[in-house]
Amino acid sequence: DQKALDKPHWSGWGLDADNTHFQPAAQAGLAPADLGNLEFKWALGFPTGASVSTQAAVLGGRIFIGGPAGGIYALDAKTGCAYWKFETEGEVRGAIQAYKRDDGKLMLIAGDRKAAVYGIDADSGKQLWKDKPEAHPWAMNTGSAAFQGKRM
């Protein structure tokens, strides 16, 4: 449901251009006094058992995370159940960024270790576009997209 994805709650490594990693309690839905009452709800294991090299994006009730063997997963934040999985050419690196398109829908931007950069519809998981900015056979993405207005 696109309405559930309307407002990014966390996108990118540091949440904002200053990389503050700060989110006010009202936006996060969690205050310091709540921390002692948190309970474990679910965990996600990857078949390779490898560590994850990406920062997840949290949008509405979904978590978008890249897998160590490739792929981007859209998970229900409350249950951990998958909405969809998008296949990538390689391991997803850097942060998954959210960008609001001109039509009002959210697009995820992510890069992989094989130097591909993807634009993915956040609701359906369908590929909107793909580019390889560097054609060198050893090229790889290890950073994250940044936005200035309509430029990435």
Report each predicted region and the residues it spans.
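Short intrinsically disordered, low-complexity coil segments enriched in acidic
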Residues: D1-D6, K78-G80, R151
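Repeat-blade elements of multi-bladed beta-propeller folds
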Residues: K7-A17, G49-Y73, G90-V117, W138-M152
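Blade/loop signatures of beta-propeller domains
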Residues: D1-F40
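A general structural signal for stabilizing positions within well-ordered secondary structure
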Residues: G29-P32, A74, F86, G119
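A structural motif specific to WD40 beta-propellers
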Residues: E39-K41, C81-W84, K126-K130
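Short loop/turn segments that connect beta-strands within beta-propeller blades
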Residues: D76-T79, D121-S124
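Asp/Glu-centered strand-loop micro-motifs enriched in Gly/Pro and often flanked by an aromatic residue
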Residues: P24-L59, I63-F64
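Surface loop/turn motifs at the tips and blade-to-blade linkers of beta-strand repeat domains
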Residues: L44-T48, F86-T88, K132-H136
